[in-house]
From Swiss-Prot:
UniProt-listed InterPro entries: GK/Ca_channel_bsu, Guanylate_kin-like_dom, Guanylate_kinase, Guanylate_kinase_CS, P-loop_NTPase
Enzyme Commission number, as recorded: 2.7.4.8
Official protein name in the record: Guanylate kinase
Molecular function terms from GO: ATP binding; guanylate kinase activity
Chain residues that bind ATP: 25-32
NCBIfam families found in the cross-reference section: guanyl_kin
GO (cellular component) term, any one: cytosol
Main location: cytoplasm
Record-linked Pfam families: Guanylate_kin
Source taxonomy: Bacteria, Pseudomonadati, Bacteroidota, Bacteroidia, Bacteroidales
Species whose genome carries this gene: Bacteroides thetaiotaomicron (strain ATCC 29148 / DSM 2079 / JCM 5827 / CCUG 10774 / NCTC 10582 / VPI-5482 / E50)
Catalyzed reactions: GMP + ATP = GDP + ADP
Every Guanylate kinase-like domain range: 18-198
Keywords: ATP-binding, Cytoplasm, Kinase, Nucleotide-binding, Transferase
Amino acid sequence: MSTFSVFNFQFSIKQMTGKLIIFSAPSGSGKSTIINYLLTQNLNLAFSISATSRPPRGTEKHGVEYFFLTPEEFRCRIENNEFLEYEEVYKDRYYGTLKEQVEKQLEKGQNVVFDLDVVGGCNIKKYYGERALSIFVQPPSIEELRCRLTGRGTDEPEVIECRIAKAEYEMTFAPQFDRVIVNDDLEAAKAETLEVIKEFLNKE
């Protein structure tokens, strides 16, 4: 994560009126279903729009699904410390969160929702501190996760095992998050997450 002066950091925080809600989870945890439910609950939530260096697909539009940058533009913005977090998933294929875009949403009073990998989630929580709530969604067990991924019927066995290995790594980050939601019952997990977020948003 980039280093900013204390003055700039405090000034930036002072200008913000919205809050941040960060979600991370292993694939197959039910995170996306929970997030989509929360977006219907009149909490003034707005999804963070990521930047990427991949080309648009189909009807995707710049500034709607993603901010589309060339690899050169992305690297230039990295050098200028414009990202809260970013990842190069493979050569010249970047994804990241632009600080300027998040601050625009916060200044509008929106509560910004992030769906990030564990490292990106921890970085944003560290940057924004108490203004951010970090939530880790996890399955009740690795065996249950394996059953869910197998039940999808979309991945080959070797792909599933790679996802399981990644999940085991990601779950080691759970203690770094403010709250851990164990999704062994989807409706209960949705209700628990909603209450956690309401409590957070109502805090001064």
